[in-house]
């Protein structure tokens, strides 16, 4: 039985981390083997707080050893990683990816390098950003950063589309084959913008921006999950990007019109299979030097 190993946070209530990623991948036809880096009652934006704890790096390694014992690693189609709770967890992930690639050289590694955002800066514990930037992102086949995380990896500021393209090209030169920028803030103009960069081309996607009273959490996790599933279906990066963009819009639309804060992942599940709305993807023409 083939599957996707998803190593990220988990909440009991709502949809963030694995709670946002696992079901969409299952709905798109994939077995998913979740390993949680933290387990909380709810996401951390609730003013009432949250309960739960982070797991030790050894907890991750122990579960991966167990999967190896039953021969599951050679059947692993992809490793998807998101929020990591410690620098040591990043090292456990690095070791896990190496083990999976050794067991199945065709397995993908998709890294969602959760670090922060332009308005918040770096929000992760000491050592995590460094390990993401120097260890996990360079070894990934696909990275799914936001604009802030891309700027950190490319070691440059991003203020325009041209800047973002240059940053993506720098990122591709460091190892990844695909860069999906899950939110390009510098183009804010009433639309939500995403950018895809591969060696074959660069593509821009725009969709209407919903004016939520409180921004839903877990959207980036959802984007990474749908995109990973699309690639594993054998779609080209552009096709997976198109599907991911349209499906995410459908979930956000359902969430907005329901007046909810938590993503309406279950109610909008048909979007993962057949998005209800289609937005054209624009290929960005690169200026020749």
UniProtKB/Swiss-Prot annotation:
Name of a matching Pfam family: Phos_pyr_kin
This entry's Gene Ontology molecular function terms read: ATP binding; magnesium ion binding; pyridoxal kinase activity
Q: What SUPFAM superfamilies does the annotation carry?
A: Ribokinase-like
The protein's annotated pathway? Cofactor metabolism; pyridoxal 5'-phosphate salvage; pyridoxal 5'-phosphate from pyridoxal: step 1/1
The answer to whether the entry has keyword Magnesium is: yes
Q: Which UniProt keywords apply?
A: ATP-binding, Kinase, Magnesium, Nucleotide-binding, Transferase
Required cofactors, per record?
Mg(2+)
| Amino acids binding substrate | 9, 44-45, 221
Superkingdom of the organism of origin: Bacteria
For this record, the Gene Ontology CC terms, alphabetical, are: cytosol
The enzyme's E.C. designation: 2.7.1.35
GO terms for biological process, alphabetical: pyridoxal 5'-phosphate salvage
Q: Which residues bind ATP?
A: 112, 144, 149, 182
The answer to keyword Magnesium applying to this record is: yes
Show the catalytic activity.
pyridoxal + ATP = pyridoxal 5'-phosphate + ADP + H(+)
Function of the protein:
Pyridoxal kinase involved in the salvage pathway of pyridoxal 5'-phosphate (PLP). Catalyzes the phosphorylation of pyridoxal to PLP.
Q: How does it assemble?
A: Homodimer.
Query: What family does this chain come from, according to its entry?
Result: Belongs to the pyridoxine kinase family. PdxY subfamily.
Recorded protein name is Pyridoxal kinase PdxY
Q: Which organism is it from?
A: Vibrio parahaemolyticus serotype O3:K6 (strain RIMD 2210633)
Its gene is pdxY
């Amino acid at each position: 039985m083939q599957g996707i190993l998803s190593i990220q946070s988990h909440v009991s209530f709502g949809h963030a981390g694995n709670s946002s990623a696992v079901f969409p991948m299952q709905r798109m036809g994939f077995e998913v083997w979740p390993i949680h880096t933290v387990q909380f009652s709810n996401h951390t934006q609730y003013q009432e707080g949250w309960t739960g704890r982070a797991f030790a790096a050894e907890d991750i390694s122990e579960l991966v050893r167990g999967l190896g014992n039953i021969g599951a690693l050679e059947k692993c189609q992809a490793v998807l990683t998101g929020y990591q709770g410690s620098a040591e967890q990043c090292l456990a992930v690095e070791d896990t990816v190496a083990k999976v690639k050794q067991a199945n050289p065709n397995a993908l590694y998709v890294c969602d390098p959760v670090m922060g955002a332009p308005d918040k800066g770096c929000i992760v514990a000491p050592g995590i950003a460094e390990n993401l930037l120097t260890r996990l992102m360079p070894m990934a086949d696909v990275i799914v950063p936001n604009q802030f995380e891309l700027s950190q990896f490319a070691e440059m500021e991003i203020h325009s589309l041209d800047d973002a393209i240059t940053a993506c090209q720098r990122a591709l030169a460091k190892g990844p084959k695909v860069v999906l920028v899950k939110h390009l803030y510098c183009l804010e103009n009433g639309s939500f913008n995403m950018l895809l960069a591969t060696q074959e081309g660069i593509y821009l996607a725009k969709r209407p921006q919903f004016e939520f009273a409180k921004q839903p959490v877990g959207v980036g996790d959802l984007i990474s999950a749908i995109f990973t599933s699309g690639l594993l279906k054998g779609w080209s990066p552009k096709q997976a990007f198109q599907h991911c963009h349209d499906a995410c819009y459908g979930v956000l639309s359902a969430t907005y019109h329901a007046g909810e804060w938590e993503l309406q992942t279950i109610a909008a599940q048909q979007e993962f299979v057949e998005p209800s709305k289609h937005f054209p993807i624009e290929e960005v023409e690169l200026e020749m030097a």
